[in-house]
């Protein structure tokens, strides 16, 4: 049996599908369906059981779970603007710690979601404490358990892998609202208003030039499955493409894919701006000093751990995503 927490969420539901594609259906899906619409992310998935996150936590504390092959822990509060530190640390740190202790006691492989938010304003994205300067309590909540893992690496009884997700986009993120990917928001803006809005230049970046390491959720699933297949690998690893691309590239991929749907030719960035299809708005004052203007994963450790598959660039991955979303309409 494999446990997937956050199973009705974005990455979690895609992980369940990835397991299903391998013929694995002995899955315990764990989530909080207070937002009932999230059930839609599990409708086409095959699972053995569903547990509410609170019931699951009690079972972990009581040691009342069946024999497990692995735990893929994706459940967390992912709202980077959440200010309630007590809530954030309980959901993102304390629950992870409890699951870790259970898995170590039972010798069960444990893969968990960390985040590139641990790097904060750093300009170096290598898995090293010298580079970890979170800008918000979300990033700190993720860093805390990474630090625990480092102190326990020499005494592990089973695999533990923390994956620092960079900017993930793809199917089944619609429930995330404002925390959904920029690709999702660009797509909906263009369909509703006929143009896409991006932040104007700030912090030394040109209009729309702020850059992130955007990674398709399909590649995130592939990384998770790689470690599931290689239980001898443990540690904290960046989960990105190793390629920073500007928000302009995401918007252009969205707009040109939707234009192609109408039989219209792709346009270069300058022409998209000239035609008003891409527009720039002032950078918000409340984000200054709290915003990562640039991220690019160093994937050296990931590649050294044996993950050799190529990863999608923005043009490929975002276009796939837009076509997938439009096919549902």
Swiss-Prot record:
Q: How is the cofactor bound?
A: Binds 1 NADP(+) per subunit.
**Could you say which residues bind NADP(+) here?**
10-11, 31-32, 38, 53, 74-78, 91, 142, 168, 176
One of the record's GO molecular function terms: ADP-glyceromanno-heptose 6-epimerase activity
Underlying gene: hldD
Q: Which SUPFAM superfamilies match?
A: NAD(P)-binding Rossmann-fold domains
Q: Does the keyword Isomerase apply?
A: yes
Q: How does it assemble?
A: Homopentamer.
Q: What is this protein called?
A: ADP-L-glycero-D-manno-heptose-6-epimerase
- State what this protein does: Catalyzes the interconversion between ADP-D-glycero-beta-D-manno-heptose and ADP-L-glycero-beta-D-manno-heptose via an epimerization at carbon 6 of the heptose.
Q: Which organism is it from?
A: Bordetella parapertussis (strain 12822 / ATCC BAA-587 / NCTC 13253)
The free-text domain remark for this protein reads: Contains a large N-terminal NADP-binding domain, and a smaller C-terminal substrate-binding domain.
């Amino acid at each position: 049996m494999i446990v997937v927490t956050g199973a009705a969420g974005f990455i979690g539901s895609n992980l369940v599908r990835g397991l299903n594609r391998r013929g694995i259906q002995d899955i315990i899906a764990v989530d909080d369906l207070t937002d009932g619409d999230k059930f839609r992310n599990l409708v086409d998935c095959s699972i053995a059981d569903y547990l509410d996150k609170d019931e699951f936590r009690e079972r972990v504390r009581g040691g009342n779970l069946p024999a497990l092959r692995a735990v893929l822990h994706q459940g967390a509060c992912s709202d980077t603007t959440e200010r309630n530190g007590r809530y954030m640390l309980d959901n993102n740190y304390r629950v992870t710690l409890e699951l870790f202790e259970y898995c170590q006691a039972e010798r069960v492989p444990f893969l968990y979601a960390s985040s590139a938010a641990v790097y904060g304003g750093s300009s170096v994205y290598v898995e090293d404490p010298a580079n970890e300067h979170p800008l918000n309590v979300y990033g700190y909540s993720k860093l805390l358990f990474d630090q625990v893992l480092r102190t326990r690496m020499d005494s592990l009884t089973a695999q533990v892998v923390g994956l620092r997700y960079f900017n993930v986009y793809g199917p089944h993120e619609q429930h995330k609202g404002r925390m959904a990917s920029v690709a999702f928001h660009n797509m909906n803006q263009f369909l509703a208003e006929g143009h896409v809005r991006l932040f104007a230049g700030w912090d030394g970046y040109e209009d729309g030039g702020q850059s992130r390491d955007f990674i398709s959720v399909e590649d995130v699933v592939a990384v998770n499955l790689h470690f599931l297949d290689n239980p001898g690998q443990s540690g904290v690893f960046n989960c990105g493409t190793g390629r920073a691309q500007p928000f302009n590239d995401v918007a252009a991929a969205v707009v040109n894919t939707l234009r192609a749907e109408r039989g219209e030719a792709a346009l270069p960035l300058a022409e998209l701006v000239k035609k008003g299809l891409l527009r720039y708005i002032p950078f918000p004052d409340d984000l200054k000093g709290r915003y990562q203007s640039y991220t690019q994963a160093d994937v050296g450790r990931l590649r050294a751990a044996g993950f050799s598959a190529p990863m999608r660039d923005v043009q490929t991955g975002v276009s796939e995503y837009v076509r997938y979303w439009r096919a549902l309409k």
